Regions:
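Residue-level signature of catalytic and energy-coupling elements of molecular machines
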Residues: 9, 40, 64, 82, ...
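Phosphate-binding loop that captures ATP/GTP phosphates
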Residues: 4-46, 61
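Conserved nucleotide-binding/hydrolysis micro-motifs of P-loop NTPases
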Residues: 4-6, 45-47, 85-87, 109-113, ...
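Conserved Switch II/interswitch segment of TRAFAC-class P-loop GTPases
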Residues: 74-81, 87-88, 99-120
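Phosphate-binding/switch loop-helix module in NTP-utilizing enzymes
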Residues: 46-94
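Glycine-rich phosphate-binding loops of nucleotide-dependent enzymes
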Residues: 40, 83, 96, 132, ...
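Conserved beta-strand segments of the P-loop GTPase G domain that flank and frequently precede/overlap
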Residues: 41, 105-108, 134-135
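C-terminal lobe/tail of nucleotide-utilizing enzymes
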Residues: 121-205
Length: 205
């Protein structure tokens, strides 16, 4: 969880125990979810999860680097790094200090967000990081009563952005109260993830 000032991954997986270290404090051990997913997050190091993190960029970048270098990840087949939005210190540190195979950009339908996505794509290109695909979150709402689709944040523009940059749109995820409920209650692993098949295909291609 590289979103240092707004970590949410532990809560999504119901992880509340603080991480442990070896005897001399040089190695940290990640927490493990019910299904065996290893998680490292600043919230797993803090006394209270609601305490603010008021750090400058270089300190935040240093913590992100520590999460990669000073955590015993053991044998890991695939690692996901959740970055905050934008092109700041965190993604820059991730791109420079980790062996990144590619990134998935997550966006939403608003015009303003599309501009930020373009910045992220251009940053990846400048640093020779492959963009595996784009995901549009909160793309639409499907009425459970009538089945009609409503575009709460306006019609999707993700396909235009993807085509302009020769990138695949790998998923358009609807607004779903059930998803929000499971994540808020720490049960992310109980989600029906069939809507994410396109993302998995892009990663494994």
């Amino acid at each position: 969880d590289a979103d240092i000032t707004g970590p949410s991954i532990p809560k999504s997986f119901g992880l509340t125990e603080r991480v442990t270290c070896n005897e001399d404090g040089t190695v940290m051990y990640p927490e493990t979810s019910k299904n065996g997913i290893k998680v490292m997050s600043l919230n797993l190091l803090m006394e209270k999860e609601t305490d603010p993190v008021i750090w400058r960029g270089p300190v935040i970048a240093g913590v992100v680097k520590q999460f990669w270098e000073d955590v015993d990840w053991d044998e890991t087949d695939c690692m996901f790094v959740d970055c905050p939005p934008g092109t700041g210190d965190v993604p820059l540190t991730v791109f420079q200090s980790m062996p990144i195979d590619g990134i998935i950009i997550v966006t939403s339908p608003q015009d303003l967000v599309s501009m930020i996505v373009e910045k992220a794509i251009n940053m990846a290109k400048l640093m020779n990081i492959p963009v595996l695909g784009i995901v549009e979150n909160m793309s639409y709402f499907k009425c459970p009563d009538c089945g009609n689709i409503h575009y709460i944040y306006g019609k999707s523009k993700i396909d235009e952005v993807a085509a302009a940059n020769d990138i695949k749109t790998v998923a358009k995820l609807p607004m779903d109260a059930k998803v929000a409920g499971l994540v808020d209650s720490g049960k992310a692993e109980e989600l029906d993830v069939s809507a994410l098949d396109g993302i998995f295909d892009a990663i494994m291609a």
